[in-house]
Amino acid sequence: MNFTLKIWRQKDAKSKGEFKTYQVENISADTSFLEMLDILNNDLVHKGEEPVAFDHDCREGICGMCSLHINGHAHGPAQAVTTCQMYMRKFKDGSTITIEPWRSAAFPVIKDLVVNRGAYDEILQAGGFISVRTNSVPDGNAIPIAKADADESMDAAACVGCGACAATCKNGSAMLFVAARVSSLAKLPQGRVEGARRAKAMVAKMDELGFGNCTNTGACQAECPKQISIAHIARLNREFLAAKLKD
């Protein structure tokens, strides 16, 4: 398979970027998208050109590092997968593929396709941890949790923090990310102790870092590689309002 790649190139955060066109040939349909970029970079290095910088780590859809807008979609045209889990068979032979970094004011470009997603780390730090007893091992089944609650918590905890929600949202909102983190603990008794403080702190930090407001367009849910529901945003709103009423 042969492809024409239009890739965003930007030397650093202060430089002006532009799209550059590259050709890749004889790509197997079973090649992953990131492997295809590896092949391109090998060719560029052999030609004495600067390779394309892009984020990656586990390449198993777990770490959330791969953060590419591909043909206008976060993580590409495939549903419920991250960029590293997508294969070239999803594209037509001879087609043009446009690749660019996340477009969000809170995710400034570092170089080429690499963005700084440290804002998500700051939101997580604002949320803090849960209280646990450190002097003994808890007894098994001492805290019963309904299966429905455990399932909802695990669904929310599937978030890998890739940033697709904020990058896709027309307002640049990180509400789905924050909601997933808050909801994963709000459904468990262990997370209730600091629940009010956590909701207020994470929302405040999100606003402070320049993320936009949620207007419920649902784009984040549609592009989320872990298919996290916007129902968690409703839970975040409820947790936040309840916490503010207690002030």
Outline where the language-model segments fall.
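Short, contiguous acidic and Ser/Thr-rich linear segments
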Residues: K20-S32
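Eukaryote-biased recognition of intrinsically disordered, low-complexity regulatory segments
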Residues: M1-Y22
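Glycine-rich phosphate/adenylate-binding loop and adjacent beta-alpha elements
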Residues: I70-G94, I99
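Functionalized membrane-embedded alpha-helices
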Residues: I62, L68-I70, C220
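Short strand-turn-strand beta-turns centered on an Asx-Gly dipeptide
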Residues: W8, V24-E25, I70-G72
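Ferredoxin-type iron-sulfur electron-transfer modules in oxidoreductases and energy-metabolism complexes
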Residues: T31-E50, I97-D247
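Short, structured protein-protein interaction patches enriched in aromatics and acidic/basic residues
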Residues: A53-M65
